[in-house]
């Protein structure tokens, strides 16, 4: 008899068939309490859980007494209570490697869009404001040869440093929990403390997960340390930044512009002051959102769950100690 799993994300037919070859699959739209109650038997007997974005917490786990493995279609897992999974000997799998290059492309796009004011001037053209040769009011700033500061030198940080160093001849500064010798050797990146990075960088790019230590890591003090010409990019997690402090820094001219893929509350409220600022490029958490990469993430998550329920957790496991 096949193990049973709960699938709370729509998959392409070929990936669904791959799952069905190994498991009895119950598809649900979400993990809301009413959904769990409606499918109580399926949840209580499920050994696997696969999907994205929904909260996986102790209350849910209490309804899933047979659960052995959860697989998230993401690299981040701040919506999952990992400690609760580990305490119940449930492994959590994620998809860290397949989205690296795509997210780095998104960060580079935000850097270019903010510096060259692409969104702002494009909207002005559409509004019929281009009636004569443009002047300084339409100008942006250069990207090439500017100093890039990367906060969080993981896979994505490395991919961004590669683009900046080789493609735009940008000096690279970085701040991370530990020094990254490969970044220093390949890109001549310079490790520094956060304050030094903020003071010297023309672009401050945040690529951090959300943890107790990183929540509101960027607030009024940090923005005050940045150059008034600096551009701030957040492609990590929204709550890493105190959004009110960011808004104030932009309004007060403490920094030049911001490119934001993530926010404290998502979706972003329609009355957010960020949406009325011409020097802000706000996009809806599209870091990995290409057809190719999202398919690859789903395929990776499927394979992760198959492997995990066969006891294979050598790669992509967040909490391997749970299997011990």
From Swiss-Prot:
It catalyses: glycolate + NADP(+) = glyoxylate + NADPH + H(+); (R)-glycerate + NAD(+) = 3-hydroxypyruvate + NADH + H(+); (R)-glycerate + NADP(+) = 3-hydroxypyruvate + NADPH + H(+). It comes from Salmonella schwarzengrund (strain CVM19633). Gene3D superfamilies: NAD(P)-binding Rossmann-like Domain. Catalyzes the NADPH-dependent reduction of glyoxylate and hydroxypyruvate into glycolate and glycerate, respectively. The gene is ghrB. This is Glyoxylate/hydroxypyruvate reductase B. The lineage of its organism: Bacteria, Pseudomonadati, Pseudomonadota, Gammaproteobacteria, Enterobacterales. It comes from the Bacteria. GO terms for cellular component: cytosol; plasma membrane. NCBIfam families: PRK15409.1. Disulfide bonds: none annotated. Keywords: Cytoplasm, NAD, NADP, Oxidoreductase.
């Amino acid at each position: 008899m096949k193990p049973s799993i709960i699938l709370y994300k729509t998959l392409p037919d070929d990936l669904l068939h791959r799952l069905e070859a190994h498991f009895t699959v119950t598809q649900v739209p979400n993990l809301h309490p009413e959904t769990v109650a409606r499918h109580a038997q399926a949840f209580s007997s499920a050994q696997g859980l696969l999907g994205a974005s929904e909260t996986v917490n102790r209350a849910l786990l209490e309804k899933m007494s047979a659960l052995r493995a959860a697989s998230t279609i993401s690299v981040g897992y701040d919506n999952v209570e990992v400690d609760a999974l580990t305490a119940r000997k449930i492994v959590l799998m994620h998809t860290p490697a397949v989205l690296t290059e795509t997210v780095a492309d998104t960060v580079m796009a935000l850097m270019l869009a903010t510096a060259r004011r692409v969104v702002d001037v494009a909207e002005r053209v559409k509004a019929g404001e281009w009636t004569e040769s443009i002047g300084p009011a339409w100008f942006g700033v250069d990207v090439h040869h500017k100093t890039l500061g990367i906060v969080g030198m993981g896979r994505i940080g490395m991919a961004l440093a590669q683009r900046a160093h080789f493609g735009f001849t940008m000096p690279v500064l970085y701040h991370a929990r530990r020094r990254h010798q490969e970044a220093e050797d390949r890109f001549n990146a310079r490790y520094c403390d956060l304050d030094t990075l903020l003071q010297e960088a023309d672009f401050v790019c945040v690529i951090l997960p959300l943890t107790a230590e990183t929540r509101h890591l960027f607030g009024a003090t940090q923005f005050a340390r940045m150059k008034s010409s600096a551009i701030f990019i957040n492609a990590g997690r929204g709550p890493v930044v105190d959004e009110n402090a960011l808004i104030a820094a932009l309004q007060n001219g403490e920094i030049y512009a911001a490119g934001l893929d993530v926010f404290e509350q998502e979706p972003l409220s329609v009355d957010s002051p960020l949406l009325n600022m011409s020097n802000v490029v706000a996009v809806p958490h599209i870091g990995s959102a290409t057809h190719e990469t999202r398919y690859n993430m789903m395929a990776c998550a499927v394979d992760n769950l198959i492997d995990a329920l066969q006891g294979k957790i050598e790669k992509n496991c967040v909490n391997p100690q749970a299997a011990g």
